[in-house]
Amino acid sequence: MCDEDVAALVVDNGSGMCKAGFAGDDAPRAVFPSIVGRPRHQGVMVGMGQKDSYVGDEAQSKRGILTLKYPIEHGIVTNWDDMEKIWHHTFYNELRVAPEEHPVLLTEAPLNPKANREKMTQIMFETFNTPAMYVAIQAVLSLYASGRTTGIVLDSGDGVTHTVPIYEGYALPHAIMRLDLAGRDLTDYLMKILTERGYSFTTTAEREIVRDIKEKLCYVALDFEQEMQTATSSSSLEKSYELPDGQVITIGNERFRCPEALFQPSFLGMEAAGIHETTYNSIMKCDVDIRKDLYANTVLSGGSTMFPGIADRMQKEITALAPPTMKIKIIAPPERKYSVWIGGSILASLSTFQQMWISKQEYDESGPSIVHRKCF
C-alpha cells in the first residue's frame, strides 16, 4: 500500500469467531472467539485492577471467573453493547489501528434486519468515527473469493447455515434459506454421542476439547448406511485422541455420525431439511433460466463445510435431486473457512469499489438509512 492510500479494514463478525485484518492481505491477521465475558463476582483480589469485561481469547482463558456471552446469535447481532466491545477489541487490541483513519468493511448475515444494518452504520460513524464504511453480505463475499459473480453459496459457520443464490453479484432474497443448524450444534451432538460411549463431556472447557475432536477427526460419509456397517464389522474407522490430561479415548462411528446431522437434521430432533435439500429448494425458488448456472456453481463456505468428504456427498445428493441431465459442480476452496473475509479483502481493494464506500459526510447528511441505498 502506498502512503496516501490507507488500507481498509475488513471485519467479518461470525457467531463463533471474528475474523479481522487489512484489505489486500490474503488472510485475516486476527481470528478470535466472538465472546464477551464479565466477572461473576466483584474483585476477589485487591489491587488486581480487574477489568469489567474481557473479549475473545482472554475471556476464553479466564472463563472460570466470568460469565460468557455471545453477542451474535445465529449470525445476527443481538447485543449491541457487547458487539461494540468486540469491535473496540478488534481495532485497538488485535489490529492496533485507529478506526478514525481507515475505511471499514463489515459483513452481515443474509436477511439481516434493516434496523441492524443501520445500527452497525451508526456505531461505526458515531462511536468509532470511521471516515468511511460499507456493509457486505457474507455469502456474496465468499462467491467473490471463488472468482465468481453468479452461483449459490452454502455458508455454514458456528451459529447458522444459509443457502444464498447470487446472480451477477446480487443475492436473491426471496430464495435465501436459513437453517439454524451449524458448528455449535454439531459440537453439542458429538458431546452427546461421546457420552453414550461412556466418556463424559459437560463443562465449557470440555466442550472446547470436543470441538477440537470434531475438527480433527470427523468426516462426512459418502454412503451413511454402508459406513455404519463398516464401522460395526471392523475397527478400520477407529481413531484415538489424547485428552489434555493424557487419557486416550477411541472414537469410531461418531466420526461420521456427527456431521451426518447436516444432511439429516432429524439426528438432532429437528424437522428441517438437510443442507442438500435446502440447497435444492433454494435453487428451485429461482427463475428457471438461472438454475443451470446455480447448479454448476455451488460454492461451499464457512468452517462447518471443512469436513472431509462433504463436497462429494453434496455432489451425490444434489445429483439425485436435480434433473437427470443437469451439470452439477460443487466448489470447495481449501481456504473456505475464511472465504468471507478473503472476499471482503478482495472487494475493498478493488479500484472500482472505491466510489461505493459510505463516507462520513454522506452519513452526516442522510443518517443511518444511507446504508440501504448504498449497500445491497
UniProtKB/Swiss-Prot annotation:
Modified-residue entries (N6-methyllysine), positions: 85
Main location: cytoplasm
Tele-methylhistidine: residues carrying this PTM: 74
InterPro entries membership: Actin, Actin/actin-like_CS, Actin_CS, ATPase_NBD
Catalytic reaction equation(s): ATP + H2O = ADP + phosphate + H(+)
Signal peptide feature range: none
Top-level taxon of the source organism: Eukaryota
Keywords assigned by UniProt, alphabetized: Acetylation, ATP-binding, Cytoplasm, Cytoskeleton, Hydrolase, Methylation, Nucleotide-binding, Oxidation
Residues bearing PTM Methionine (R)-sulfoxide: 45, 48
Coiled-coil portions: none
Pfam families given in the database record: Actin
Modified residue annotations for N-acetylcysteine: 2
EC main group: hydrolase
Cellular location(s): Cytoplasm, Cytoskeleton
Post-translation changes: Oxidation of Met-45 and Met-48 by MICALs (MICAL1, MICAL2 or MICAL3) to form methionine sulfoxide promotes actin filament depolymerization. MICAL1 and MICAL2 produce the (R)-S-oxide form. The (R)-S-oxide form is reverted by MSRB1 and MSRB2, which promotes actin repolymerization.
Enzyme Commission identifier(s): 3.6.4.-
A single GO cellular-component term on record: cytoplasm
GO terms of molecular function: ATP binding; hydrolase activity
Post-translational modification N-acetylaspartate, affected residues: 3
Functional description taken from the UniProt entry: Actins are highly conserved proteins that are involved in various types of cell motility and are ubiquitously expressed in all eukaryotic cells.
Similarity comment: Belongs to the actin family.
Protein name stated in the entry: Actin, cytoplasmic
